[in-house]
Amino acid sequence: MTNPDKQKPVEVTDVETAAEKTSEPTPASGTSTITQRWKREDLIKKASPITRGICLLFSLLAFLIMVSNKHGYGRNFNEYEEYRYVLAISIISTLYTAWQTFAHFSKREFFDRRTSTLVDFSGDQIVAYLLISAASSAIPLTNRFREGQDNIFTDSAASAISMAIFAFVALALSALFSGYKLSTHSFI
């Protein structure tokens, strides 16, 4: 055998031998895909009310901390729009997540399935946006107060804001779960 191009002969590499050794998937792999999907859907069914419950807890804490933030003239939460906004949105978030948690655990359907899924998805997104909006509006005011004097009023305001941010994170995760549920339904 002559080599007209005068090139080295090509040797078989480990990658090529590994590719030859791999076999076609067995018919049983389809069932494992189905069971993986069932496990994923079961995990989402369990995680969604848990994230809403966590949001309920943090929203309630933000509400209670902000309401109790009264420390005399110039140090009352109700003298500042930003803090009143955090209070109002934490009340809305508490009511929304309490209603969603009650609806889930009572197994009652207030709407048909399609409407309920749409309400879950849109409600989670709207309330999550309101939570982060309220927190982001109050952060600059709290930072300005901390530059002048760091006291219990600013600490309470900062803790209420952080609870609102934690509630946002929990509700944003719940919105992801709601979006997944919405995308997997066949009525879309």
Curated annotation (Swiss-Prot):
Residues 1-34 are annotated as: Disordered. GO terms for cellular component: plasma membrane. Pfam families: CASP_dom. It is a multi-pass membrane protein. Belongs to the Casparian strip membrane proteins (CASP) family. Homodimer and heterodimers. This is CASP-like protein 4B1.
